[in-house]
């Protein structure tokens, strides 16, 4: 987002950004093609080894996720900034390694709406700080959001997922990550930035204080959720607290032979070398796991967050409580995203009332 916003508004003072400018910007976005992608048709693994790299050493030098290197080896598409970092590490021109694949698709409505929300948030902060008198984004016609239905699992699908992971003896960190996502409703980036000190085992809570994000040219960065409105304290179910305790004991046993132990400042989820686990690594692992189990209902890590919300709403958890758990800025956001789930819950509640009172009314 940042490069696009800087190109459009970077030379303007805040009070020069008006509603007309914002409307024109959204119109341009709707006519913008999605970013082109790159692939390597020549056998990337040969290029890599010819230049003295292993998969891991190239990943480290280029500063990209392991899944990116895997995609390049398989001839799959990768993003431009990843391709640029890889060829920089190899010391080769971009055109010698990758071919550009132009996109024929335009930015969708949800992407344009996301730009609007970011600009509105920036301008509202400027109002709060007294730089401008009012927020011009409030009077611009809001880009319409696509009504594409969200995907989530039913409770029985969640149970099947857990049972299959246990039968497969999947890596402990990925098993716990998926359990935590579905039991807390956290965003993937928030969970991967969680430290042991953020969990209060006495109170049974988890404080969401930071998240991990990728910044071009800088790699993975940690940012404070208090600046994004996503800070919150989540109550943890007993079963997840138990899983966290078991995982910490497991990590302690791993470190014991070298005279170390888990520290409160450590992240829960780390690579073998101690670095932060890349968010894309979790998504890549989930994709591979489901490819081995076509019998399961497929879901993404973000879909597990939707699953948590749907379970709460279908069990009549008040909307403000669900919104707070998810870290939404207000209940309206939650209601808009989960409108279909809320409507289904209302129908179920109506039928429940009917099942209780109907026999009496019919016998009058």
What are these regions (language model features)?
Residues 60-64, 74-75, 91-92, 193-199, ...:
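A short, basic/aromatic helix-end/turn motif that makes direct DNA contacts
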Residues 83-96, 100, 164, 216-223, ...:
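DNA/chromatin major-groove-contacting recognition/catalytic segments
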Residues 32-51, 78-84, 102-115, 128, ...:
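Basic, Lys/Arg- and aromatic-enriched nucleic-acid-binding interface segment
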Residues 18, 111, 115-118, 154, ...:
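Hydrophobic (often cysteine-bearing) scaffold residues that line and stabilize catalytic clefts
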Residues 73-77, 152, 211-214, 326-352:
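Catalytic-site neighborhood detector that most strongly recognizes the C-terminal catalytic loop/helix
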């Amino acid at each position: 987002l940042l490069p696009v916003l800087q190109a459009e508004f970077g030379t303007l003072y805040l009070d020069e950004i008006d509603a007309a400018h914002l409307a024109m910007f959204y119109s341009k976005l709707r006519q913008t093609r999605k970013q082109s992608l790159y692939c390597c048709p020549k056998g990337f693994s040969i290029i890599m080894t010819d230049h003295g790299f292993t998969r891991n050493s190239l990943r480290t030098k280029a500063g990209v996720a392991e899944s990116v290197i895997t995609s390049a080896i398989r001839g799959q598409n990768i993003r431009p900034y990843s391709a640029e970092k890889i060829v920089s590490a190899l010391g080769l021109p971009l055109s010698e390694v990758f071919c550009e694949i132009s996109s024929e698709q335009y930015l969708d409505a949800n992407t344009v709406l996301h730009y609007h929300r970011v600009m509105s948030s920036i301008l509202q902060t400027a109002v709060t700080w007294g730089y401008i008198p009012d927020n011009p984004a409030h009077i611009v016609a809001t880009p319409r959001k696509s009504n594409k239905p969200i995907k989530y699992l039913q409770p029985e699908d969640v149970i099947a997922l857990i049972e299959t992971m246990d039968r497969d003896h999947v890596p402990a960190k990925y098993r716990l990550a998926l359990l935590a996502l579905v039991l807390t409703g956290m965003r993937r980036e928030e969970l991967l930035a969680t430290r042991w000190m953020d969990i209060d085992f006495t109170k049974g809570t988890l404080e969401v204080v930071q998240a991990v994000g990728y910044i071009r040219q800088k790699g993975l960065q940690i940012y404070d959720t208090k600046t994004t409105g996503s800070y919150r304290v989540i109550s943890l179910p007993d079963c997840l607290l138990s899983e966290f305790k078991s995982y910490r004991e497991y990590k302690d046993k791993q470190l014991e032979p070298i005279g170390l132990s888990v520290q409160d400042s450590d992240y829960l989820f780390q690579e073998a070398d101690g670095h932060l686990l890349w968010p894309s690594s979790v998504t890549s692992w989930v994709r591979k796991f489901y490819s081995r189990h076509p019998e399961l209902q497929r879901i993404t890590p973000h879909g597990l967050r939707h699953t948590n919300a749907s379970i709460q709403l279908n069990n009549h958890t008040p909307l403000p409580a669900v919104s707070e758990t998810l870290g939404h800025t207000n209940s309206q956001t939650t209601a808009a995203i989960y409108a279909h789930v809320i409507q289904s819950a209302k129908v179920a509640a109506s039928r429940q009332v009917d099942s209780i009172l109907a026999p009496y009314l019919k016998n009058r």
